[in-house]
Amino acid sequence: MSQYRTFAAADAVEYARQFGGVDNPNSLVDALEVGDGNLNLVFRIFDTAGVSRVIVKQALPWVRCVGESWPLTLDRARLEAEVLIEHGKFCPQHTVNILHYDPLLAVTVMEDLSDHAIWRADLVKGIDWPQAAGQLGDYLAQTLFHTSDFFQHPHQKKADVIRFTNPELCDITEELFFNEPYEVHARNAYPRALEPLAESLREDHELRVAVAGLKHRFYSNAEALLHGDVHSGSIFVAEGSLKVIDAEFGFYGPIGFDIGSALGNLLISYCAAPGLLPPREAADAREKRLNDVRQLWQSFAEGFLALAAEKSRDRALAVPGYASTFLAKIWRDSVGYSGTELIRRTVGMSQVADIKGIQDDAMRVECVRQAITLGRSLILLADHVADIDALIARIRQNG
């Protein structure tokens, strides 16, 4: 790791000239640092015409918003690149194309998606991409099926579980999803007016037991190679296109975690809409988010079952009916994990633009209250929400 150095813009340009795959490398002349996350530098590389041509991303050895007191492994750059390369084998149409990565410098070069929009940014503005949820469901079906026991040879699967072991970033997930929102913690960031509600989460024994079960399955169930951080801020959308990026939290874990994270993000948008948009537009946006929830699950479920029927390699798992049984288990997990996503994004430190963008303080409090209440309900009732219709009915009942 002695070769590691933090890139400046000029370093990113020079690196892109070497590994960006452009026809005329010397045409790359400028870089703009555009990263808005806490873990990485992200440079957009421009040519002489001012056109963005390629992305150079470098992992930082610490969390940006905290500093050197929160160090992080640089191996996550390798993990992210290899997860995306692996996912790209099975779903290239919805996975960002990795052009090159260097584990010693913790640098990845990838395709530029400047012709796409970040899905979350458009959701906040009330812009709808009706195809996106179905495309995301397809991505999840393809990547999670093909890296599961249904398809992988058991020897390869066991080797890949080791190859993609990601303890440091999993530790962050475990803290932010399953521990800190249910404790008095300095990193929690909910509105002061909701202290009684936050306290009720800490004191709800039934809820804490359910969260413990979700955390235990996150620890123990190496079902498929997860993206590990599926949310609308790590998804780019354009007409007819969806691309998933930012897989540094990837590891072998429970399939329902990726599905639930995606569903939970759509539900955050659902809860936030009244604070971001005029009443009529907000009501319309909420209906569209419920349709997205339906489309995402149906696309995933139909895709997974079709792949299982056609491509299962394990003789026992290929027995007719087993894939449906397994899918029912994924469904229960997905509902529960969607609840933890809602709570960690509103009680915990990982606040998102959907909530932060609400200008009216009282409205923000009410939107956060609704998200927390819905999250709690989904965690507690995950085993009793029979299907997608029941889930949508439960969401409507929450308000």
UniProtKB/Swiss-Prot annotation:
Residue numbers binding ATP: N40, K57, E111, D112, L113, D246, A247, E248
Reactions it catalyzes: 5-(methylsulfanyl)-D-ribose + ATP = 5-(methylsulfanyl)-alpha-D-ribose 1-phosphate + ADP + H(+)
InterPro entries to which the protein is assigned, alphabetical: Aminoglycoside_PTrfase, Kinase-like_dom_sf, Methylthioribose_kinase
Listed GO biological process terms: L-methionine salvage from methylthioadenosine
Binding locations of substrate: D229, R344
Function in brief: Catalyzes the phosphorylation of methylthioribose into methylthioribose-1-phosphate.
Record's protein name: Methylthioribose kinase
Gene that encodes it: mtnK
